[in-house]
């Protein structure tokens, strides 16, 4: 374990003492340091009437157990404090470490002992994570240090788990959205599952906008998958134009219906453990699936502003601007009189995507979005540079396939009976509008691009994204983060995992940092917390995070690619083509081994290379036909320690998100030997060699110069490392599988690689 403590808020001695005393630690500024230390330690063992017993099982020095030390005349030194603090945090001498000071250095222990400031040290110790992944104070509260009295209690600017999760209110309401997406003449109703603690004051909400949450139709999804094998068709040259998105919600009016209490409850809904964490700390949890999902009405419009409006309506209801009904009969309305109107949105992938879309509406009441692996442009999810480009791991998926997956109204037989025929008509229109045959950007995709609306965002923004996420690729967060308005509170966590959550990792106190931020923004805590702009996981060191100021360096380093002409054949023999089409992982493995149709350029680095941004290939090439796909990958090549891209479980159920509530596993990305690592990649239709909106002819056997931007990343390579450039045509994971007989020729002498770096110019 290594500490990267973001969440601790430096405080005054007076505040520290007051907070310690409020928790029952009977310390005083006038006490001798050793006396305060003893009082603090004995309080940790509040389950014991005889606290001598647990103290006797700890050590203070190599010669003295802790109980004997406290009774002795020995002084409290840094060595003693550090050794005892480590044990309090769950580290075991002679098991986890032998030399205390070496271990303190190794793990980046965040507390610097000062006998004159011991109470500040003890205050920070309570706010420091244990080996198990929870802070010491959260561990104590989970054991019953404070009662579950349904009142807010804070420590170091963060809410504690004092809300009773054994007696929660679970209710369902139906919010009226200003939409009629299924064209039935009635405004769409949106089902909202609410879980909230019993509180005497108005409380904020965590909202997860999840089209998956009311069920998914995998059978319909699988039937709708598109065939990847086919021939890349040349496109007529033209300039693509689109109009600004012009979504207009329908008119609504305040309801005059009588107000009633909830008429529908539920016992269980799958939850997100970050929401559970906040539920125990006095935040309501709302799960909303939006239009076209089971329990709601409407059509699944998949990514456009109509879908986003269905989630926005819920925030409007929480603030008294929209109507909710107790049932589909629409005969009683229900008020969110428990809500303080402030909302934070959470969730990964599609869920985080809806957070971004919501933020671009500028809706009042949305205080913070915590958007993980979020899409900012749906074109860039299902297309790339004029090509159909399946998200990593899901060849054949497209937006209409996702519609089939998430249109969970068809999982209700009555809804299927009444609405499926009309749904199929709307789905057919959607399938035509996405222009799978051409791969072009068009109005359909522009209406699902949130980047042009980024200047409307006014809430605090937190993004997390994996730099090995080839499902929702890094360009999604790169573009939205760099499009955010100046002066906005914005924060980005970049890790080296794939499409994964990171709130339960050992090496970073993400959960606690979000607690401090949300208490500041949603509970009026003037805690002085400041979250860095960019927190990046250092790819060269285990469990190490660094603060950066920008995603995208201003300096460029030009790297030559060679002197030869190289030929890349597109066509494979029938056996190989079938094998690769059946299992794209076999293609990837052989590509990285140099066994596919490809050009490989190995570059031995003569100095460190700190990549930050979009690497760019400047290439001179020609195609033997009037079409062509160019795919590229950059690899950190050669055996050495690197991060795996899926977090491993370190300890099951070690994280308690409340008081014996919603336990989850502690995880971390393994750091282990590997033969190579993908640094970045990309695909390009050569007819879009100038830009996305310009389609150009490809003249047979005539040289072209292209600019090819790869996915952005932040990745540091060291002097002596090998940067491998892999160039090829068809990518069996992502692109159309075109096995036609054409080839690309590259003039490497007239080509180069341009690397953005975070070096100062």
Curated annotation (Swiss-Prot):
Its EC number is 3.4.14.11. The lineage of its organism: Bacteria, Bacillati, Bacillota, Bacilli, Lactobacillales. This is Xaa-Pro dipeptidyl-peptidase. Homodimer. Keywords: Aminopeptidase, Cytoplasm, Hydrolase, Protease, Serine protease. InterPro entries: AB_hydrolase_fold, Galactose-bd-like_sf, Pept_S15_Xpro, PepX_N_dom, PepX_N_dom_sf, Xaa-Pro-like_dom, Xaa-Pro_dipept_C, Xaa-Pro_dipeptidyl-ppase/CocE. It is found in: Cytoplasm. It catalyses: Hydrolyzes Xaa-Pro-|- bonds to release unblocked, N-terminal dipeptides from substrates including Ala-Pro-|-p-nitroanilide and (sequentially) Tyr-Pro-|-Phe-Pro-|-Gly-Pro-|-Ile.
């Amino acid at each position: 374990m290594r500490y990267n403590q973001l969440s601790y808020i430096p405080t005054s001695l007076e505040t520290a003492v007051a907070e310690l005393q409020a928790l029952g630690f009977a310390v005083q500024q006038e006490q001798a340091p050793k006396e305060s230390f003893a009082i603090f330690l004995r309080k940790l063992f509040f389950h014991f009437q005889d606290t001598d017993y647990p103290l006797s099982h700890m050590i203070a020095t190599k010669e003295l157990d802790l109980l004997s030390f406290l009774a002795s005349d020995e002084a409290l030194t840094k060595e003693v404090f550090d050794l005892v603090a480590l044990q309090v945090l769950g580290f075991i001498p002679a098991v986890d470490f032998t030399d205390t000071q070496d271990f303190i250095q190794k793990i980046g222990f965040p507390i610097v002992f000062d006998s004159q400031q011991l109470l500040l040290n003890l205050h920070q110790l309570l706010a420091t994570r244990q080996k198990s992944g929870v802070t010491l104070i959260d561990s104590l509260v989970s054991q019953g240090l404070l009662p579950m009295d349904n009142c807010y209690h804070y420590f170091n600017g963060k809410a504690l788990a004092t809300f009773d999760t054994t007696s929660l209110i679970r209710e369902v309401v139906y919010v009226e959205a200003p939409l009629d997406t299924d064209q039935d003449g009635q405004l769409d109703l949106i089902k909202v599952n609410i879980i909230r603690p019993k509180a005497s004051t108005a409380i904020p909400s965590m909202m997860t906008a999840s089209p998956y949450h009311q069920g998914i139709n995998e059978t319909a999804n699988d039937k709708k998958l598109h065939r990847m094998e086919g021939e890349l068709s040349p496109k007529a040259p033209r300039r693509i134009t689109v109009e600004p998105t012009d979504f207009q919600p329908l008119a609504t009016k305040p309801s005059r219906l009588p107000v009633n209490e909830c008429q529908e409850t539920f016992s269980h809904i799958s939850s997100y453990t970050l929401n559970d964490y906040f539920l125990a700390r006095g935040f309501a949890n709302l799960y909303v699936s939006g239009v076209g999902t089971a329990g709601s009405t409407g059509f699944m419009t998949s990514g456009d502003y109509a879908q986003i409006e269905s989630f926005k309506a819920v925030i409007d209801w929480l603030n008294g601007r929209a109507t909710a009904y107790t049932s589909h009969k629409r005969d009683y309305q229900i008020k969110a009189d428990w809500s303080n109107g402030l909302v934070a949105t959470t969730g990964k992938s599609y869920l985080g995507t809806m957070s971004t879309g919501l933020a671009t509406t500028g809706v009042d009441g949305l205080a913070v979005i915590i958007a993980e692996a979020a899409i900012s442009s749906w074109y860039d999810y299902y297309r790339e540079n004029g090509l159909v480009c399946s998200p990593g791991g899901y060849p054949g998926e497209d937006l209409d396939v996702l519609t089939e997956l998430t249109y969970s109204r068809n999982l209700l037989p009555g809804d299927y009976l009444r609405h499926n025929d009309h749904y199929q008509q709307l789905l057919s229109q959607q399938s035509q509008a996405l222009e799978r045959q051409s791969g072009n950007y068009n109005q359909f995709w522009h209406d699902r691009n949130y980047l042009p609306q980024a200047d409307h965002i006014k809430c605090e923004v937190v993004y997390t994204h994996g730099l090995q996420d080839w499902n929702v690729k890094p360009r999604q967060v790169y573009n939205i983060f760099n499009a955010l308005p100046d002066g906005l509170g914005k924060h980005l966590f970049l890790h080296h995992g794939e499409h994964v959550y990171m709130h339960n990792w050992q090496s970073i106190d993400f959960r606690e940092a979000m607690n401090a931020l949300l208490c500041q923004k949603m509970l009026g805590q003037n805690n002085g917390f400041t979250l860095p702009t960019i927190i990046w996981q250092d790819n060269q060191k285990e469990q190490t995070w660094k603060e950066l100021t920008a995603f995208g360096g201003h300096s460029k380093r030009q790297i030559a690619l060679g002197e030869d002409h190289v030929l890349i054949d597109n066509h494979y023999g029938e056996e190989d083509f079938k094998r690769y089409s059946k299992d794209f992982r076999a293609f990837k493995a052989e590509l990285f081994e140099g066994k596919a149709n490809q050009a490989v350029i190995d570059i031995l680095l003569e100095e460190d290379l700190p990549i930050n941004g979009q690497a760019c290939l400047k290439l001179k090439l020609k195609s033997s036909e009037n079409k062509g796909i160019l795919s590229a990958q950059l690899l950190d090549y050669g055996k050495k320690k690197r991060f795996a891209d899926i977090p491993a479980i370190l300890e099951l159920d070690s994280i308690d998100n409340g008081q014996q509530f919603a336990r989850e596993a502690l995880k971390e990305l393994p750091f282990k030997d590997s033969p190579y690592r993908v640094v970045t990649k990309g695909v390009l239709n050569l007819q879009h060699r100038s830009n996305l909106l310009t389609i150009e002819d490809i003249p047979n056997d005539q040289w072209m110069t292209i600019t090819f931007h790869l996915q952005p990343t932040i990745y540091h390579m060291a002097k002596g490392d090998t940067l491998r450039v892999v160039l090829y045509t068809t990518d069996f994971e992502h692109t159309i599988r075109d096995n036609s007989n054409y080839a690309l020729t590259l003039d490497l002498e007239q080509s180069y690689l341009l690397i953005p770096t975070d070096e100062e110019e």
